[in-house]
Amino acid sequence: GRSWEATSRALMTLLSLGDVLDLASGDGVFAGLIAPHARSVTCVDISGAVINAARKRLSDIGNVSFHEGDMHQLPFPPASFDHVFAMHALSFSTDAANLLTEAHRLLRPGGRLVLAVLRKHSHEETMRAFDHVNLGFEEAELQALLRGSGFVAQECSVTSRESRPPYFEVITAMARREKT
């Protein structure tokens, strides 16, 4: 919804995104926003129906490709992407550490990970309604996961607070793979 859109619009200031991986890409709205700023965008989602909806939505954009599969174990060679976006992908991750390690593997040296995720909450009914598999994360927890996956965390903070119940907060994090 509006949280990832606000974050993505702020990130539009990044020039020349290069080759982009969009994890848990959903129906392709985010990919459509960043495609004009990228050499290529690869959308990954576990749902074939969602991938088909994204393919239909973005059929007129030539630099976007689609992959149905598990974001925790992707078939791409190491160092394939300049940027990995995980806009609420962690909400659907059964193993956040593994997902971040996979993102690190797929980034080129100096590449950047940008993620957004709900801050820790207690709304289990919402979690179930949206097929989330966890109740979010705290900033310190995310920073530790990023470091443990080999990233240098550059930013990790609450960037959005909803003004009505259940008052969800969104954490946005940016991290970089070392240039070595």
Region locations from a protein language model:
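Conserved alpha-helix/loop element of class I SAM-dependent methyltransferases that forms part
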Residues: 2-19
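Class I SAM-dependent methyltransferase SAM/SAH-binding core
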Residues: 21, 26-73
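A conserved beta-strand element that flanks and buttresses the S-adenosyl-L-methionine
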Residues: 85
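A short glycine-rich, Lys/Arg-flanked "PGG" loop and its adjoining helix->strand segment in the class I
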Residues: 97-112
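Short, glycine-/aromatic-enriched active-site segment of Class I SAM-dependent methyltransferases
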Residues: 118-134
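Short alpha-helix
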Residues: 134-149
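Conserved S-adenosyl-L-methionine
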Residues: 151-162
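Core SAM-dependent methyltransferase catalytic element
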Residues: 160-180
